[in-house]
Regions:
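Active-site and NAD+-binding cores of ADP-ribose-processing enzymes
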Residues: 155
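Glyoxalase I/VOC metalloenzyme domain signal
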Residues: 1-54, 61, 66-150, 159-271
Length: 271
């Protein structure tokens, strides 16, 4: 856990997660949306055509409802989290899902979610890769069930392959899901993912940082492998993005990518 990011590594034998891993390999088998009321959100989703998933809760665990999402994955509904509706530490009822279903490690307090870690603070987006011709269908899935709206559309035609993408965003603006498909019949990186994953699914998770340079330094020091970028990329930054205001030497040293325009920059790096 770090900032507003919570990952669960599920190694439970004979579980949905284990069966999912056998089919798709190491991947994302489920995500969870925070909602004000689980019962209302779940029943609404079912009434709009979602397929429910009947999970089995262990003794003392919360019974968390879920629906079937993209590529055999699940979408859970959670309405218990620390700080909900402005609750403060020590307030009655200020407990979360992790307080009920998990036990903290020795020496780790209940407020470990505030640990500084490597400067990662939130989940920026969850990119879905789908078969060609299915982008609109999955965009409609999130629009119909969760009132997401399309905020951007891309149709990028490369020399060999292309990509089409719809960027969907939740009403609160905190959940962003780009949905990608191949832009033409020539197989590219999206089809490569579909082949390796054995179907449609969540291709990557993007994590936000308040200081990407410091975060990259910390991640590399911790042994995390990040993708390289050729030096000539940085020779063209000033021409490609006039007035960007970033220190290109610092970006080059860390192999951080820069896109956008002055005042609307995106700094990113891939693992």
């Amino acid at each position: 856990r770090q900032g507003g990011i919570n990952f669960i590594v599920n190694a439970e034998p004979d579980s949905f997660a284990q069966r999912f891993a056998r089919l798709h390999g190491p991947s994302i088998c489920a995500i969870a949306f925070r909602v004000n009321d689980v019962k209302t959100a779940y029943e609404r989703a079912l009434s709009l055509g979602a397929w429910g998933y009947a999970g089995v809760a262990g003794p003392g665990e919360l019974n968390i409802p879920a629906i079937k999402g993209i590529g055999d994955s699940l979408i859970y509904f959670v309405d218990k989290w620390r700080g909900k509706n402005g609750a403060q530490p020590g307030d009655i009822g200020n407990i979360g899902f992790f307080d009920v279903d998990f036990e903290p490690l020795p020496g780790v307090g209940a407020d470990a979610l505030h640990a500084p870690g490597h400067g990662l603070t939130y989940i920026d987006h969850l990119t879905h890769n789908v078969h060609r011709g299915r982008m609109a269908e999955w965009a409609g899935f999130y629009e119909r069930l969760f009132n997401f709206r399309e905020v951007r559309y891309f149709d990028i035609e490369g020399q060999v392959t292309g990509v089409k993408s719809k960027a969907m965003t939740s009403p609160c603006g905190k959940i962003r899901i780009p949905i990608n498909e191949e832009g033409n019949e020539k197989a590219g990186q999206i089809q490569e993912y579909l082949d390796r994953y054995a179907g449609e699914g969540i291709q990557h998770i993007a994590l936000g940082s308040t200081d990407l340079l410091k975060t990259v330094d910390a991640l590399r020091a911790a042994g995390v492998t990040l993708l390289d970028t050729i030096d000539t990329y940085y020779e063209l930054v000033d021409k490609r993005i006039p007035g960007h205001g970033e220190n290109v030497t610092e970006l080059k040293q860390r192999k951080i990518l820069i896109d956008g325009k002055a005042g609307e920059l995106l700094l990113q790096i891939f693992s």
